[in-house]
Amino acid sequence: MLKTERMDRVRAALRAQGLTQMIVCDPKSVWYLTGVAVEPYERLLALYLPTEGEPVLFLNRLFNVPEPPCRTVWHTDTDKPVAQIAEVVDAGRPLGIDKEWPAKFLIPLMETHPGMPVSYTHLRAH
């Protein structure tokens, strides 16, 4: 179940930092905000959280999540999930990135949208 109050607190903190969107990838933070608990290991798990609009969850089909709580973009190990994220983010606005997102995902996103402002954020999902 989507944790709307928790998301609203994170959105308020984003606005306070001048951000309008964020990629949350720490599995515990994703669980805290969505109720979806998976351990991705080396695979991509991400929650795109805009300050306005619907969040988008990016999940590998290997993860057993029968009823995701929000819009979900599924991928497999042979897909390019960063390209899927690149289609959702607003490249003209600063993007907050949580502290856990590996460079193997962040760098390709930045290469897809050169010049997109990216901010490492100290926000905690609480």
What label would you give each PLM region?
Residues 22-25, 97, 117-120:
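General beta-strand structural signal in soluble alpha/beta enzymes
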Residues 25-27, 59-61, 97-101:
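Structural motif
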Residues 59-73:
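Compact, glycine/acidic-enriched structural inserts
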Residues 71-81:
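Short acidic-hydrophobic, aromatic-tinged amphipathic segments that line or gate anion-handling sites
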Residues 84-88, 92-103:
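Hydrophobic alpha-helical hairpins/lids featuring a short glycine-rich hinge
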Residues 121-126:
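Conserved small/polar residues in nucleotide/adenosyl-binding loops
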